[in-house]
């Protein structure tokens, strides 16, 4: 119907065979790794990942993934340049294929960290009680609006110090060697 109504513009279907894909198509070679380090004094994060930033936005994307998974502001996340003394050699970055690999590695690492920190927080709540947790700045409820920002919620501890729940939890986790 569109083609009959338009003399010069036409719609059609095209099939294009592709001989060469992107990447190696060998799982062994298409891997990435990430290390996430928490600074216990302020809760800031340093992400080491093997991808090389060559203008494709890898560092920004990995930073966004880490912030989203951990539920903390991007300003608290710092990206480290690729360094083989921390992370093994990555897959190639050609055609921006290294970016999704590196971001997936960051995602999985941050998910593991989030799980460990959450388990630690719930263990504190169970073992120490609600009052102890609230006094130490681990309070998951925002009383002002009834909604929280997760770990980015700013709370006061028993000394009226303001900090994010994330900062309080990571400090306690470091103290307890979690």
What are these regions (language model features)?
Residues 73-78:
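Short acidic capping loops at alpha-helix termini that bridge into adjacent secondary structure
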Residues 1-46, 50-69, 83-178:
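Cofactor-centric catalytic regions
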């Amino acid at each position: 119907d569109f083609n009959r109504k338009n003399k010069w513009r036409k719609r059609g279907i095209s099939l294009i065979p592709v001989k060469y894909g992107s990447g190696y198509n060998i799982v062994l070679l298409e891997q990435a790794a990430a290390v996430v380090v928490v600074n216990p004094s302020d809760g800031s994060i340093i992400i080491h990942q093997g991808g090389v930033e060559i203008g494709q936005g890898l560092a920004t994307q990995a930073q966004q993934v880490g912030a989203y998974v951990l539920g903390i502001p991007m300003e608290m996340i710092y990206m480290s340049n690729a360094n083989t003394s921390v992370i093994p050699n990555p897959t190639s970055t050609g055609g921006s294929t290294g970016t999704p690999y590196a971001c997936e590695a960051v995602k999985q690492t941050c998910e593991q960290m989030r799980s460990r920190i959450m388990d630690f927080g719930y263990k504190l709540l169970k073992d120490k009680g609600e009052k102890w947790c609230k006094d130490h700045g681990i309070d998951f409820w925002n009383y002002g609006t009834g909604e929280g920002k997760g770990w980015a919620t700013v709370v006061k501890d028993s000394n009226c110090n303001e900090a994010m729940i994330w900062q309080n939890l990571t400090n306690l986790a470091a103290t307890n060697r979690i």
